[in-house]
Amino acid sequence: MDKYIGKRLDGRYLVDELVGIGGMANVYKATDVSNGRIVAVKILRDEYVQNGELLRRFKNESKAVALLSHPNIVRVYDVNFSDRVNYIVMEYIDGITLKEYIEHKGVLDWKEAVYFTIQILRALQHAHDNGIVHRDIKPQNIMLLKDGSIKVTDFGIARFARSGMHTMTDKAIGSVHYISPEQAKGDVTDNRADLYSV
């Protein structure tokens, strides 16, 4: 049994069920008992709490998404960083990933592909206008809602384009099938890397 299910985080978020397992965090469906809203809580796994780089990425995600307000980007409601537990409270998305949709349906027809792409590009335009480069655009990080709209998620390796972080990383960051050549080489990236990934 998962140690968070059935527990309240900070007396406010009642964790109901595990809904996703990511590279560094697990995502739970929960209830905000202060207002009854269903939320998603992304909790950094215990084995990564002492990993400075992953903790920095996790905090970076909350900062990046908190700056954004767009219908095609998942919203952040609350964050908590402590010695005990680190989590991000986000909008709960009742849907599937674009990857799951494509695996189920097969090849998308051109109208559907254009419809999804326009929504992704609108989300990225908003992020770029706010100085944020996602750097990990892939079907697994795009949620498809029942009404056909999409939400871009997982800003865990996002970079603030205006933050002065214009140095080479010497390591590739992103998902190998979708990253731009400059990302693959560990070079500095900008918003064009996101467009390449789309």
Describe these PLM feature segments.
Residues 83-97, 101:
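Conserved short submotifs of the Hanks-type protein kinase catalytic core
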Residues 120-132:
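Protein kinase catalytic-loop region centered on the HRD/HxD motif
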